[in-house]
Amino acid sequence: MIIFLKKYKSKIALIVFICVLVCTVSCLLGFKSLEKQKMPGLEKKSVFMAAENTVAKNTDKAVNEPKLHAVSAALYDADDETFIYGRNMRDSMANASTTKLLTCIVALEKADINDTVTISQNAASQPAVKLGLVAGNSYNMKDLLYGMMLESFNDCAYAIAEHVGGSTEGFAKLMNEKANEIGCLGTYFITPNGLDAENDISFHHSTAGDLCVIMSYCAWKSPKSTQFLEITQTMQYTFETKEGQMVFNNHNRLLTETDYCISGKTGFTTKAGYCYVAAVEKDGRRMCLSLLGCGWPNNKNYKWADAKSLVEYAVSDAAEDSYCDAACVTTQQTGDTQTCLLYTSPSPRDISGS
């Protein structure tokens, strides 16, 4: 009897061992099978891979992308708040008189367009391009805004800034606060007219991407957008001063040379090169484009050729199907293809003391 029980226990132990062995082998085989299948959700992807995949889905559009002279450029869908195209669009660059877009909208929001502005010696002494404001004389805010936006007069920009901000430093603070408010964290302005400048914090700069967002705000999202568009769409403006009649002409050629441009601002300094920012509209689709470092003297028309290329691309079928991810904001050109690199937005700048 004892011998029988021992044999019985041995058989049970053997059966248990075999069962455990079979289960273990089955689990191992199952795991390897899952590994081979690479089931969704089991793979690890870096954020860089995710950015590459976003671009990869549009590589077939690369041959249709505009060929530009600009060092930095961007094309922005103002409704979706996404970038359709970008080249070095988060690089900090001098941006010349495109600064006046923000100068104009801050002035419209903070002051009355019918204010009377007394001209300081500082404003009167600004370099060309200038209206020739006379220190001590008074002008209407509206006339100064038209002079700044149509003819890009530097003295008008300073007079507006001092009136609205109390000083150019005070106005720069208002500009940088507005830039931060609308998400333009790559922008830092020192002068209201965009002339090159530096201080202890940084140099006067923006990015192609930020300038698109600034234009989008000015043209469509500010409570003063209607007034802004009225000013920037005016082809010729005339008013009377003590010095006689003044006539301003709009230098935004795209208003008459394309069917879609509704606003724009040019710019140039030796450091910035030729610059241009515009708002375009077709069939209710609202977009902005920006160009920085778009040639230097003897290549003044590069910006118009580039702008037209971007406008044509913006209203084409290719652009309607394109998408540049928020992470895809800095680009490198390699042959006929475009590689987008990951960009991380900086933290909001402390501008309380600037």
Task: Describe each model-derived feature in a short phrase.
Residues 108-109, 216, 349-350:
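Solvent-exposed alpha-helix faces
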Residues 343-354:
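Single conserved hydrophobic/aromatic residue that forms the stacking wall/gate
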Residues 1-70, 322-345:
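N-terminal secretory targeting signals
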Residues 36-209, 219-221:
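Active-site-adjacent loops and short helices of periplasmic peptidoglycan-processing enzymes
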Residues 184-185, 200-345:
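Domain-terminus/edge residues, biased toward the C-terminal soluble/receptor-binding domains
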Residues 86-88, 291, 353:
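Short clusters of small/polar residues that mark proteolytic maturation junctions
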